[in-house]
Every structure is written in structure tokens, then in C-alpha cells.
């Protein structure tokens, strides 16, 4: 029986302007993969990993050491896993256009599926809808057409900015998408983007922000 792991924003390459912090966090992130995540996935016989966006931290300038590490990570340590990687806003060069993305250095890997547009997919008999970071025009189209796909998917996995959810401890998002759009059309919504884990349920339909897997500050 196949199993899926869902992991939140990694922000590899965070704090580029502080060399000590950059190196400390990068070493910690590497240890998380080699000493925690990968051993746990193998022990639990998980074969598919869904990354909910923001694999990288810097939108416009990727440190060459980070780029080389990420390429090697998916080519070597993660080669036995099917990896579904959503494009987050930090993986996107332009603020409101997804065409240029830092994920381009891994999407040719045979084990990687990069989600750069809204993509339906069936995994192990379960219907998923994958939603990358939504530009303003994409968000408008998503909202206009969401009722056409309502009830068709067991899980929606995205990189949503949703009002009323904490993006950090003690800070609530006051902008973005009205959560009713997700509650009214999907049974289970799972999202990256916000760094604090949270869960809310309305009339049996839920939104779950998975949060970051480690401290980023």
C-alpha cells in the first residue's frame, strides 16, 4: 500500500545577508533531511512526498551552493521517492507571473513532478487537485470556476494565502482568499505558505496549514 508524506515550506537559502545565520540554518536544514525526514519516510515505507511550496527562500537570486545541494538532493537522497513539488511565491521570480521559477533546475528529474499550474492528479485511487501560488489573474479564475470542480476531489493541496489563519505565531492574515471559497467547495484543503501549523473545520470541511518543518529564525 502506497503512503504519502506532506511537508511544508523549507525556504532553503534563508538569511543570505547574514553569513553566519545562513550557514547555520543551511547546515540544520541538511541535517533535517539526512537525519530526520528521509530515515522516517523509509521506516514508514512512504514512497511519495508532496512539497507544498517555497522550497527555496530567495525569489531572484539563488546561492550556487543551495542550487547544487537541491539538485543533488532530488537526484540522490530522494531518488527513490516520487516527489510532487508545488511552486510557491518564493520559488517565483516575478511577483505576479509564474513563468520563471527556481524549480526549473529539478523539474527534469524523473522522480519530480513540478506543479506550476493548477493540476488534477489521481494518486493511488485518490483524486487530488494541486494548486501552486496563485497570481492575481489565476486567483480570479480559480474563484470564478471553483464551483465547477466542487466535490470532485478528496484533497486540494495548495500554496494559499487565506484570511483568518496565522501566518506566524500571534499574527493573523487579514488579506488573501476568503476561506469560505475553500470550505464551500472542498472536503479537505491542505496548504503551505504560512509558517505556523493550524487547522480549522467548518461543516465537516477542513483547511490545514502544515507549517514549516523547522524554525527559520
What label would you give each PLM region?
Residues 46, 125, 151-153, 186, ...:
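Short, well-ordered alpha-helix to beta-strand connector turns
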Residues 117-125, 200-202:
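Short acidic-hydrophobic surface loop/beta-edge motif
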Residues 2-3, 10, 14-120, 182-186:
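Core catalytic region of metal-dependent phosphoesterases/phosphodiesterases
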Residues 163, 168-217:
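Conserved beta-sheet core of the metallophosphoesterase superfamily
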Residues 123-181:
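Binuclear metal-dependent hydrolase catalytic cores centered on His/Asp/Glu-rich metal-binding motifs
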Residues 49, 83-85, 128, 154, ...:
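Hydrophobic/aromatic residues located in beta-strands of well-ordered beta-sheets
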Residues 9, 53-54, 88-89, 159, ...:
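Active-site glycine-centered loops adjacent to acidic/histidine catalytic or metal-binding residues
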Residues 3-14, 125-134, 155-159, 207-211:
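Active-site-proximal beta-strand elements of phosphoester/diester hydrolases
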Amino acid at each position: 500500500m502506497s503512503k504519502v508524506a506532506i511537508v511544508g515550506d523549507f525556504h532553503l537559502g534563508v538569511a543570505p545577508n547574514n553569513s553566519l545565520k545562513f550557514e547555520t540554518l543551511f547546515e540544520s536544514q541538511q541535517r533535517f533531511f539526512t537525519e530526520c525526514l528521509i530515515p522516517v519516510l523509509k521506516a514508514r515505507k512512504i514512497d511519495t512526498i508532496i512539497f507544498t511550496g517555497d522550497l527555496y527562500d530567495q525569489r531572484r537570486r539563488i546561492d550556487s551552493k543551495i542550487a547544487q545541494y537541491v539538485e543533488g538532493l532530488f537526484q540522490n537522497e530522494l531518488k527513490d521517492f516520487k516527489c510532487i513539488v508545488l511552486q510557491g511565491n518564493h520559488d517565483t521570480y516575478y511577483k505576479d507571473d509564474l513563468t520563471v521559477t527556481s524549480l526549473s533546475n529539478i523539474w527534469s528529474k524523473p522522480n519530480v513532478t513540478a506543479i506550476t499550474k493548477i493540476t488534477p492528479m489521481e494518486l493511488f485511487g485518490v483524486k487530488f487537485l494541486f494548486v501552486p501560488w496563485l497570481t492575481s489573474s489565476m486567483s480570479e479564475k480559480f474563484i470564478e470556476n471553483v464551483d465547477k470542480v466542487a466535490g470532485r476531489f478528496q484533497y486540494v493541496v495548495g500554496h494559499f494565502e487565506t484570511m483568518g489563519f496565522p501566518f506566524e505565531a500571534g499574527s493573523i492574515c487579514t488579506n488573501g482568499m476568503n476561506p469560505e471559497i475553500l470550505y464551500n467547495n472542498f472536503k479537505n484543503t491542505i496548504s503551505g505558505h504560512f509558517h505556523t501549523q493550524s487547522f480549522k473545520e467548518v461543516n465537516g470541511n477542513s483547511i490545514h496549514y502544515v507549517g514549516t518543518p523547522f524554525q527559520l529564525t
